[in-house]
Amino acid sequence: MTRSEAREQAFIVLFERIFNSDLTIAEIIDAAQEEGLIKINGFAASLLQNAQENEDAIDKLISENLKGWAINRLPKVSLAIMRLAVSEMLYIEEVPVGVSVNDAVELAKKFGTADDATYINGVLGAIAKSL
């Protein structure tokens, strides 16, 4: 599995968690793997663990860089993608920030809209400059 594929699998879990916030990441992974819906490798597991453990800090950083939006009004796809990317940017040192941003934009193009991709690129670009 490539890192891009691992990010997509992690995105799916984070997106699901938005709708099932009473479940842990581990519970969502277990249920989805039992159904054969996802495969989580070590890289994806690390992204997810960091995203869950640091969700408040990640959301604060995202909120500080939103232009014209409140975090609770963001499309859920965009929120999950940004949480994933910021988790990677902050806590996975061996991945260049530009790679995290680019893959987030690609996820937005696949699962969201062109407008989502553009907005996510802008927000993550602002976050990258602040790091």
Where are these regions (language model features)?
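N-terminal interaction/assembly modules
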Residues: M1-A117, N121-L131
